[in-house]
Design a protein with these regions (language model features):
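Typically the conserved alpha-helix immediately C-terminal to a functionally engaged Cys/Sec
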Residues: 78-91
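Thiol-based oxidoreductase modules, predominantly thioredoxin-like and allied folds used
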Residues: 69, 92-108
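N-terminal targeting signals for export/organelle localization
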Residues: 1-48
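Non-catalytic, surface beta->alpha helical segment in thiol-disulfide oxidoreductase systems
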Residues: 118, 123-176
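A short glycine-leucine-enriched loop at secondary-structure breakpoints
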Residues: 113-117
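Short active-site neighborhood of thiol/selenol oxidoreductases, capturing the structured segment around
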Residues: 60-73
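The canonical Cys-X-X-Cys-His
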Residues: 74-77, 122
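Alpha-helical transmembrane signal-anchor/signal-peptide segments
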Residues: 47-56
Length: 176
């Protein structure tokens, strides 16, 4: 959006030269404001869990828990937000969905405990609080390489090309 607008301004403004500089600068500022607004609207927002102790309270509440480990600067995390909302609607009160921001102190503590390196990653706990599934990006570029689903021992179970509402709901229902 920014580049085409700037390019259009550069190509269509007359006169060219010093007189065009204010118009180009104004266009650049408008583009940055619009882009910033879009980014703010898509950000995943505040985490539900800020420490391992908080996560433990959710884990031992007597129902399955789906944990998303995300980053506010991760574009895939932003896209996954709608998938999580749809999964939450499908699962209703049968499951708790919580989010952990990875680049925080609590997020790093939780990520270290479960060997999470990249976002978005997901942990599925059963109603007893036991980890039953981990969904992690295969590499830092999950759009290209997909995700690995691991069991409670860390053994490979299956591969997902992308995170879908159906996959999340199925994994959580299996944990119930």
């Amino acid at each position: 959006m920014v580049v085409p607008t700037l390019l259009a301004a550069l190509l269509t403004l007359a006169p060219v030269g010093e007189a065009a500089v204010p118009a180009i600068a104004a266009t650049a500022v408008i583009d940055l404001v619009v882009l910033g607004g879009i980014w703010l609207a898509m950000r995943p927002g505040a985490p539900d869990v800020r420490s391992a102790a908080e996560l433990d309270r959710f884990r031992h509440a007597g129902r399955p828990v789906l944990v998303e480990l995300y980053s506010n600067f991760c574009l895939i995390c932003m896209a996954t937000r709608q998938v999580l909302k749809a999964a939450a609607t499908d699962l209703g009160a049968n499951c708790q969905i919580v989010r952990v921001e990875l680049p925080t102190a609590g997020g790093r503590e939780i990520a270290g405990a479960y060997r999470i390196l990249y976002t978005p990653s997901f942990l599925v706990f059963d109603a007893h609080g036991d980890l039953v599934r981990t969904i992690i990006p295969d590499t830092i570029t999950p759009l290209a390489n997909g995700y690995r689903v691991l069991d409670e021992t860390g053994a490979f179970v299956s591969r997902l090309h992308r995170i879908s509402e159906e996959d999340l709901v199925r994994l959580v229902r299996r944990a119930a």
